[in-house]
């Protein structure tokens, strides 16, 4: 095994020390050779790969966090059918709800009947999937700071010499640099906060943001100079539906404009005069300046600062971590109260023997998902001690009057749909009762209204109907896939879900089952 003469030349201690150093030298040589041959295994390389992997995961999560057409909208004139043939239908909704609340997919997966969910998206990937990163602007060149990775919207913040040419839907940024790098210096955005939905975005104009050198030819000259910033947004998409009016437009417009303190000009593309008029009271509080229907402008409007698009990160929620001073839905609701003169800030607190009657508003639906026994529900609620109001808001409803009526209530109740959006006018500590129809849409219903209610300081209850409470039982046998396997309809796409579970389903509440929900609401009103 070893040379005895060599061994006799050294003491046992020296032999051990020599052996130790020999092993150490051999180890160092082996590691050096290994690293030389396999540089990818260098510790720094491993660290770098880990960082790149994490960044890739984060980016992928952001790109996948797209919200699709939600089941709450009344499918009328503003609800667009599937945008194009060949649309992918692999998932109905994906939404980034942050770490503080479950995502839409998590919410849907919490429903054991919901084994498959579908999504209705354009075959052309939305900007979220096309973007590879958040743009890091070059201040020297005057590049915009663009965020194309948000879950719901894309936007660019621009500073410098900004010129808007409406007839080409182009925002020019004129750089002081003599030459611009040969690489493409243009960006595009559709300024509406539902970017993952092909049905919504098909009616939203695409705008180009183009960086040019000041000495280039054909740069438009300013005809109107403005000393205030501007915000570009679209009133296309699903505007006209109450849920989308707030989630896609009013909440993002509010949160995007707050930093300007009223000194900002709104530029509305895809301008709909009736829509702006409906919410004129809100716009007049957000800006001291007129709204420009930018598509019709022949003048070249110039600004030194602009936000092209709206900042929206969560469904029907303001993500406080993304805005200065902890801006939240609580601030937005205070804004609504002051605008519409909503007097009540807190719901009633019931006391034993107090003789008080909490007011309950039942949202009535005229066409789809109707409550066919509204009268019976109303009578039962009154026997339990409620004062009951049955109401239905339409396009012609006076918004101020209706907001004040909702604010006078302590409980808002209705079948899943856009009418529940009126919870924004409720006082704090009020209760939202959402009746969820058949169809495996529980998770979607919670994302639309259940999760946002928490940020609004509203208590939330839900009542999930059974097959015997659905009008579908009159159309299909109980062993039909409509009842046994809603996921099979999800696989067929949004049209199948809408047709069967939303357009053709009405609800007849089992009074015995539902009574406990109304009793629970009363108990909640006894404690604040």
Residue ranges and their predicted role:
Residues 2-528:
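The feature primarily captures lumenal catalytic ectodomains
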């Amino acid at each position: 095994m070893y040379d005895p003469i060599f061994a006799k030349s050294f003491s046992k201690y020296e032999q051990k020390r020599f052996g130790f150093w020999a092993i150490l030298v051999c180890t160092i040589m082996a590691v050096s050779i290994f690293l030389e041959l396999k540089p990818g295994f260098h510790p720094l390389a491993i660290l770098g790969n880990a960082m790149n992997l994490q960044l890739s995961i984060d980016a992928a999560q952001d790109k996948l966090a797209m919200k699709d057409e939600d089941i709450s909208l009344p499918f009328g004139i503003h609800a667009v059918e599937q945008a194009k043939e060949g649309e992918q239908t692999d998932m109905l909704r994906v939404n980034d709800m942050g770490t503080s609340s479950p995502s839409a997919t998590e919410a849907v997966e919490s429903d054991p009947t919901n084994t498959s969910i579908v999504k209705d998206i354009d075959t052309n990937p939305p900007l979220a999937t096309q973007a590879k990163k958040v743009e890091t602007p070059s201040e020297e060149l005057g590049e915009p700071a663009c965020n194309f990775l948000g879950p719901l919207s894309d936007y660019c913040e621009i500073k410098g010499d900004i010129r808007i040419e409406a007839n080409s839907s182009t925002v020019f940024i004129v750089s002081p640099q003599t030459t611009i790098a040969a690489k493409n210096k243009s960006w595009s955005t559709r300024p509406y906060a539902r970017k993952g939905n092909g049905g919504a975005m098909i009616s939203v104009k695409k705008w180009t943001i183009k960086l040019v050198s000041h000495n280039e030819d054909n740069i438009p000259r300013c005809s109107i100079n403005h000393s205030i910033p501007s915000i570009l947004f679209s009133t296309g998409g699903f505007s006209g539906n109450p849920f989308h009016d707030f989630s896609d437009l009013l909440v993002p417009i509010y949160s995007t404009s707050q930093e300007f303190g009223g000194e900002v000009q709104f530029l509305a593309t895809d301008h709909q005069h009736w829509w702006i008029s409906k919410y004129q009271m809100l716009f007049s509080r957000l800006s001291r300046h007129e709204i420009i229907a930018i598509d019709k402008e022949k003048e070249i409007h110039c600004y030194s600062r602009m936000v092209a698009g709206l900042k929206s990160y969560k469904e029907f929620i303001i993500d406080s971590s993304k805005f200065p001073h902890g801006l939240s839905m609580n601030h937005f609701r205070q804004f609504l109260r002051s605008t519409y003169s909503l007097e009540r800030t807190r719901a009633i607190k019931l006391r034993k023997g107090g003789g008080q009657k909490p007011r309950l508003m039942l949202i009535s639906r005229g066409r789809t998902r109707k409550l066919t026994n509204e009268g019976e529900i109303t009578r039962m609620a009154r026997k339990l001690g409620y004062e009951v109001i049955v109401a239905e808001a339409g396009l012609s409803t006076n918004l101020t009057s209706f907001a004040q009526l909702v604010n006078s209530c302590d409980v808002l109740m209705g079948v899943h749909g856009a009418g529940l959006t009126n919870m924004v006018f409720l006082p704090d500590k009020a209760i939202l009762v959402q009746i969820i129809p058949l169809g495996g849409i529980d998770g979607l219903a919670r994302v639309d209204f259940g999760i946002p209610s928490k940020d609004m300081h509203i208590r939330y209850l839900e009542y999930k109907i059974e097959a015997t409470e659905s009008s579908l039982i009159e159309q299909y046998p109980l062993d039909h896939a409509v009842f046994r396997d809603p996921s099979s309809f999800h696989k067929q796409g949004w049209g199948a879900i809408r047709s069967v579970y939303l357009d053709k389903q009405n609800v007849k509440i089992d009074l015995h089952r539902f009574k406990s929900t109304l009793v629970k609401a009363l108990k909640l009103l006894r404690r604040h």
